[in-house]
Structures are given as structure tokens and as C-alpha cells.
Amino acid sequence: MMTSVGTNRARGNWEQPQNQNQTQHKQRPQATAEQIRLAQMISDHNDADFEEKVKQLIDITGKNQDECVIALHDCNGDVNRAINVLLEGNPDTHSWEMVGKKKGVSGQKDGGQTESNEEGKENRDRDRDYSRRRGGPPRRGRGASRGREFRGQENGLDGTKSGGPSGRGTDRGRRGRGRGRGSSGRRGGRFSAQGMGTFNPADYAEPANTDDNYGNSSGNTWNNTGHFEPDDGTRLDFIGVEGSNYPRKFETAPGAWRTATEEWGTEDWNEDLSETKIFTASNVSSVPLPAENVTITAGQRIDLAVLLGKTPSSMENDSSNLDPSQAPSLAQPLVFSNSKQNAISQPASGSTFSHHSMVSMLGKGFGDVGEAKGGSTTGSQFLEQFKTAQALAQLAAQHSQSGSTTTSSWDMGSTTQSPSLVQYDLKSANDSTVHSPFTKRQAFTPSSTMMEVFLQEKPPAVATSTAAPPPPSSPLPSKSTSAPQMSPGSSDNQSSSPQPAQQKLKQQKKKTSLTSKIPALAVEMPGSADISGLNLQFGALQFGSEPVLSDYESTPTTSASSSQAPSSLYTSTASESSSTVSSNQSQESGYQSGPIQSTTYTSQNNAQGPLYEQRSTQTRRYPSSISSSPQKDLTQAKNGFSSVQATQLQTTQSVEGATGSAVKSESPSTSSIPSLNETVPAASLLTTANQHSSSLSGLSHTEEIPNTTTTQHSSALSTQQNTLSSSTSSGRTSTSTLLHTSVESEANLHSSSSTFSTTSSTVSAPPPVVSVSSSLNSGSSLGLSLGSNSTVTASTRSSVATTSGKAPPNLPPGVPPLLPNPYIMAPGLLHAYPPQVYGYDDLQMLQTRFPLDYYSIPFPTPTTPLTGRDGSLASNPYSGDLTKFGRGDASSPAPATTLAQPQQNQTQTHHTTQQTFLNPALPPGYSYTSLPYYTGVPGLPSTFQYGPAVFPVAPTSSKQHGVNVSVNASATPFQQPSGYGSHGYNTGVSVTSSNTGVPDISGSVYSKTQQSFEKQGFHSGTPAASFNLPSALGSGGPINPATAAAYPPAPFMHILTPHQQPHSQILHHHLQQDGQTGSGQRSQTSSIPQKPQTNKSAYNSYSWGAN
């Protein structure tokens, strides 16, 4: 879904540049055009057509007339485009807004378009142009919105090549990352499925930061890219379009990484991962042997020399030992992680893992450097660096540097940690051996050396030996600490070296990756284990991981297998830039089984996390979390709280994850890291990667479980963490979409972080964790966790509610929950909700909610309450009350609060027994209001019979007040405004006041999101209309007449109800459907009346995030 969505958006944005161009062209003679338009506007001859179009637009899109008119106007009367604009999110609006800025760039943009026609040559030219344009100035340009936008547009052009997604990404606010986008676009060209939009969240999340911070800090790789972009860019240009892209691509890669949440991002990442693989090649440099790796090898060598200048010899030696066989594999997986992951994984896993170690170190470096420099670069840089550098650095640096050294380091981490890892590992007894498999997974770094050793089944010795060598290379290898130390240098070196390597790799990538362009992620994801490994994001990688786990399970076979599998995980990780974190996570997933979350999370966090984790599991982890938290925070500026929360949450999670006590202690940091990562991705991307780490994705989740098996806690933790991660991941996708939205979505998921919190709480207990995971997943709509979803729901239901509400917003995850949630909420939550809401007669209230009530109410109502009502309500007595109430309502909404009760009281007074029900129902009067809505749907008669009793009051007040939701029972409508705030919220239940309570929320928060809802006046206006009830009730004083009268309104109301159902519980749910924002609020409101206030705040940010 995400892919399609991304593509559509991309196309939409892709069109935007064209639209913008058109707009620009139009604007050039704008004065005349404006005059013409003014004339047209003044003249009436076009009005018929225009109005017809507007009406058409309104019917099709359901937008406001103003919006439709504006969109139509912007689209110059092009209804189709206007529809797209309205539904796609007004890409044109931005274009128009940007037109002024873009004009300067328009020439370039046009050139870009022209170039886009000549994709290959022009791409290179454009890349060179980008290098020049963006090289030195491009950085400024990047920083400058104009440059970015131009890049974005060009990217959009590229997007055309790339299939449009990049264009979309570029056009979006993510233009900030324009340069990266450009490369992304080109990459997109290489990979039709770029997921440009996917990493957009990250891009926009960290546009400028990425540029400067990127260049300066952890941007090591990025730094080179950015700083050296002119040179590198040129060099890259020589390499080819890819080369030029590379610097940007790094940027893009970060974006793509962020997109990790989306599957599209993975594609970009794969490219980036290829770059990463270049790094890997660097590692392989010792193993430059494979011709296929030649490019990579060269790149790797460069990376090794540059990145691992100090360690390359030892690293290379180790790598040579491991890599000789792995190098080709590694190179291949690295180059084309997606397709070759598994096969190549085996050898590659060593190298790859080395990279991973390196990445971890780099990640750690990023964490350290990122933290230090990350302050500024944290968010985008970290995300990017973590993802890109992580993937690249991981693969390249880890593979090359860490390959031997870091690998050793990792190995040390895993080997040295193997005792503790043993704690982590399910198979403590087999500590070395088991750990070795885990080390393979966990210490993928040693994997290159160690992995092969594992293959050789000398993992303990190798691990130890590897560990030993790394210490010599202590800068990198020395545990995570050294790794971090090294990583700064390494990362820097890597960054500079990687670009060339990546450039070369990129060419290769074009050769190799081109084949897997789109399939690599989107298509291949479901593909073979290798590909699945590549598709770390959604568990495909995990599939590779699963074998790894199995392999891990049996050390002997496992060694080779696990080498592959980890490689697969790792490589796939590396392969998927999105998997960068993912890959880390993927590894870490694999790791997870081994180092458990420490690796897993570390990987997730940053490679650094894993390094820390693995080296100094906890300590590093914490640094990782620190590093990652900056990342996350920056990345999650939106999710900032999330990242913090994630930390707590994840910490708990880590505990949960940490099956072993030692692991647990690490785990917290580890967990926190993943959480941060998730939060960081909040960013769907990071989250995805992060989640990935867990499972690299919700799906990974399952995969992770296998890992989990290996990693006992991992199974619970991995699974749960993965689940959490995956949940977040799913939720993010892209969330978000990564989408931000993914990011915001992520943030929301991270809001869900509560869920994570719950998770963390439950995390302690792996089962709860599972539940939590499930809940997150459910929020993420991870089918995987769905099973536990229930559990999670139970444990984290509130969070889940948020999540679920959010997940639907994160539609990218393809969460059907949106509809299900509304329905679930309507049936399930309503059931629970009404009881919650109605402490009164739950049965009656519920019944009122349900058809039975409609029927039963008519029976009961007529029987007891109805009679009483008929006497008083339908009859003059109630009408009299109504009048009083109406006056009371009219007098003050505050009294209205009382009014509802007074109504009840008076009604009760008049109809004590019967009114008792009615009255309790009445507080549910809101409920009744909703009932009229709700019942209006199925049992309007009953509702109205019931309602008339209420409505007669409502009619008076309602009519008096102009149908403030006349059905609300006069009091309610008024309560809505003022009374409701106190009353509705006071009555957590009154939230029911689906009408009032929700309308309140919707009015304030929701209305923003859902203007229609707002305009609906909280359904007060529409309900009033739909409720011709007041009049129906009023006119039909007797219940029967009222009912009869109500019937017509009821159908009408019913019709409205579907649309406005948010008012009633259905309305709530419906609004959720209608407005994702609403969904969050509504679903939580209805599902969690208790949380209305919290949800309310959460909704504001959360719902918005979701939207």
C-alpha cells in the first residue's frame, strides 16, 4: 500500500513540478492571466461550468466548496487535477507557493525536465550540475529552501525517471534534503520504487541539519558527501549518475533510510546500502578479490584505507581471511543486497557483519560524533547517518574496519559478551558456540571473521581471536568504546572514503541494483529468504534471519548458515539503506537472538548502539541510546517526546528484551535505543529500521521470533521488541511515513510509545511484551502481532487505541484497523465504551446503542419509561419540562450540564421510575443524542420514541438554540459548548457525548483536521438538520408521532450519521475514518473514555501527527 501510495504521491508531486512550471508559465504573463481570470470571475458565463466542476469536486472529494474552488482555480479548471490535488494534499498549492522561489530554479528545473528526458546522460549531467550546483553551493542551496526545492523539483523530474516517487519526495517539504533527493530521484530512476516519499519524513525532518550537520558531524560519510560533494560529486559524476547521486544519495539515503518505514525507502536504501556495501567493499578491500566486488572492492579498499586506515590492515587481514570467500558474497549482497543477500550473506555476513560492527562503531561514532556534532545534526544526521552511515558505515566500515577489527570488537563484544550473551542467549550452555551463532548474528562484525569462523565452527576461538585482533585495532574494535572512538574517525574516514567507494558501488549498483530496482524492496520483500533478508523492513529480512536463527540454533550447520543468514540479515540490512537501521536491526534481530537486544537495539539505534551494546552492552547501549536519542529527538523533533518516552519505554523494553539478566541491564539501554530508534524513526524510517531491528518490520517480527528462539529473551524480547519496533515500524511506515506523517505518525506511534511504555511495563514480562508488541503492531496494524494484538490491546489498549487510531492514519502500514477500529470500536469499543461511559444502566445504554435497545427501548420505553415519557415527555408534562430545560439550556450551557441531569431529575421527577432509565440514558442523553444518531441508523423509531421523550426537551432548547444537536437533549447541546467541557469530560463517560464530548474535541482539535466536521458544527448543525428531530420531536409531541416524525429525520439523520457518525459512537468511529486525526481522537475517546483529556492532548499532536 505504501508503495502505491508513495508512488501516487510521487506522481502527484511529480506532476507538481510540471504544474509549477505551468503555473510559472502562467505567471509570467500572470498580470494578463490574472486579469483574464478576474474577468472570468467577474463574468458569469463560466460560472455554470465552473460551478458544475466545483460541485463535481465537492461530490467526489467531499471537500469544502472553498477548497474545491481554490483547487479548481489552481488547477485552471482541470477537474481531474483538482481532484488529485484535493485528495493528494494540494501538491499544487505548495508549488504555487514555491513558485516565487522556484522561478529562479525553474530554468534549472526545466533543464532538469529536459534532462529527465535523457535520463542516463542528463542524469549524469544533472548530477554534475547538482554537484556543481549542490556541491559547494548546493550545500547552501540545500540549506536554502529554494535550492532544496529546486532539487526537489529536479528530483521530481528525476522522480519521473525514478518513477515519480522521488519527485514527490522532493516536492515535499523534504526538499530540504533536495540534494539527497536528487540522488534519490536518480536512485529512484534506478529503482522505480524509491520510496522517495518514504524517506521524505526523515528528509523533511532533517533537511538543513542533515546538510550541515550531515557534512560536519556524524555526517562523516555525509560530510564527505556534503563537503566533498563538488569533488565527490564530480567524481561521482564521473562514476556516473550514481556517482553524482552518491553525495546526494547519502542525503537521500538518509531520507531513504527514514523512508525505511515505507518499503519504497528500502529501495533507495538498497541503493544506499549498495553504497554501504561499497563500504563493505572497502572492508572487502582486503577481499577486493571478487571482480563483482571490484567496484565495491575498490570502494571498500578506499573505505578501508580511508575509513579504516588504521585498522584496514588488521581488518583487511581479518577480512581477507573471512572475506576472501565472503568478499564476493559480501560485495554482491552489499552491492545488491536485495537479491543476493542470502547467498552472499554467508560470506558477506562476515564482511557485512564487519561492516555492521563498523557501522555499529560508526553508529556509535555517530552516536558519539553524532551526539557531539549530532546536537545540530542529531535528528537528520543521525537518522541519515544512522541509516545511511549506519548502513554504509555498517557495511563498509563494519565490514572493512569492523570487519576484522570491529568484527573482533563485535566478536569481542559477542565473544567477550558471550558469557553475558549466553545470559542473553537462549543457549547459555553453548555460550561460545551458541553465542557464536549469536555472535554471527549479534556480532555481525566478527561475523566477517567470526562468521566464517562460525562457518568453520571455530566461532569461540575465532570470536576470541577476532576479538583479540580488534582490540589491537582497538580504535575500532576496542569494544564499543573504542568503536565509538574509532567510529568518529572511522565514520569520518568512511564518509569520505565511502563516497568514492559508494560511487563505484553505485555504478555497480546500477548494474546490480538496477535489476532489483523496485523489486529489491517492494517486490522482493515477499520474495526469497535472501530478498526477504533484503526486505529487512518488513520481515523479509527476518525470513533470512529465521534461517539464521535456525542456523544459529545448530551451531555447526548454523555457522555457515548463520553466517549466511546473518549476512542475509546483515547484508540485507546493509542492502536496505532503509535497513541501515533496519539492517542493523535486522542484524540485531539476528543479533537479537545473539546479543539480543543489545545488538538488536544497538543496531537499531545506530550501529553504534549495537557496538556499544555488544561491546559494553549496557554502557554502549546507553551511549547508543544517547546518541540515538539525539538522533531520535532530532529526527523526532515531532517525536521528541517519543524518543524520551521511547527511551523509558524501550528501556523497559530492553529489560523485557533482556532475557538474560545481563542482557536486561543492557537491554534497557538497548531497548531504549530501539525505542529511541523507533521513536527516532518515529520516523517510520528509523522506526522501521528500528522496528526492523526487532523484526525489521512487523513481519520481521515473525522472523525475529525465530531469532527470538535463538535469543530466548530475544524470542520474547526480540519478538516483542521487534514487535514494538515493528509496531512502530509499521505504524511508522511509515510511517508514516516514516511519513513521517510517517515521522509524526511515528511520533504518534511513539505516542503509542505509551503503548511502548505499556510495552515496557509489560515488556518486563515477555508475554506482556508480546502483547505490547501486538498492541503496537495492532496500532501499526502489523498482522504479525495481531494475534497478540488482543493481548496488547488488553494491556496497552489505551495506547493501542491511540496506536490503532494512529495506525490507520499510518495507512501506509496498510493498517486496515482504521475501518476495523471504527467498527471494532463501534461494536467492541462501543460495547465496552458504553458501559464505561454509561455507568448508569449499562444494559439500557448499551441496548440503546444497539438494535436491541432500539427495539427494547421502544418496548421498555413504551412500557415503563416510555409511558412515563409519553406522559411527561411526549405529553405536555415532558414538553413542559422541555420548555423549562430549553429555558435552562438557553439560560446557560453550564446549567445545561445540570440540565441534562435536571432533565433527568425533572423527568425523573415527573417520571421517576421510567425517567430514571431515561435520565441515566439521558446523561447518555448525549448518548441518546448519539442514539438518535446511532439508533437513528437502526432503530430510529426507538431512538425517537426514546428521543422524543428526550427531544421534546431538546426541541425546545434545541430549537431555541438552533438545534445545538437538538437530539443532545436540549441540555446536552448546550452542555456541549460549555457544560460539556466540564460535564462531558467530567463524565469520562460523557465522552459519549459522542456528540458533545467528541464534538468538543473535534471542534477544537478535530475541526482543524476535519474542517467539515468543524463546519458541521460538531454535528450540532448537521445533527440538528439530521435531527429534524427537534422539530420532529417537537412537532410529534407524542412519542409515536415523534417517532413517526423522527423516522423521516432518522433516515436523513441516518444518512448523515454515516458521515457524521463520529458524533455518535458510530460517528466517532466514522470520524476516525473520515479524519485520521479524528480517528485517533475518536477512537480513543470512544475506546478510552478515560483518556479523553490525555487523548485530547495526544490527539492534538497525535491526531495531527497521524494526519
From Swiss-Prot:
The modification Phosphoserine is found at residues 376, 380, 436, 474, 487, 490-491, 497, 624-625, 628-629, 872, 879. Residues 1-33, 92-229, 461-513, 550-676, 689-814, 885-921, 1060-1107 are annotated as: Disordered. Pfam families: UBAP2-Lig. One of its GO terms (biological process) is stress granule assembly. Residues 133-145 have a biased composition (Basic residues). The keyword Acetylation applies. GO terms for cellular component: chromosome; cytoplasmic stress granule; PcG protein complex. CDD domains: UBA_UBP2_like. It is found in: Nucleus; Chromosome; Cytoplasm; Cytoplasm, Stress granule. Keywords: Acetylation, Chromosome, Cytoplasm, Methylation, Nucleus, Phosphoprotein. Interacts with BMI1. Part of a complex consisting of UBAP2L, BMI1 and RNF2. Interacts with G3BP1 (via NTF2 domain); promoting stress granule formation. Recruits the ubiquitination machinery to RNA polymerase II for polyubiquitination, removal and degradation, when the transcription-coupled nucleotide excision repair (TC-NER) machinery fails to resolve DNA damage. Plays an important role in the activity of long-term repopulating hematopoietic stem cells (LT-HSCs). Is a regulator of stress granule assembly, required for their efficient formation. Required for proper brain development and neocortex lamination. This is Ubiquitin-associated protein 2-like. The gene is Ubap2l.
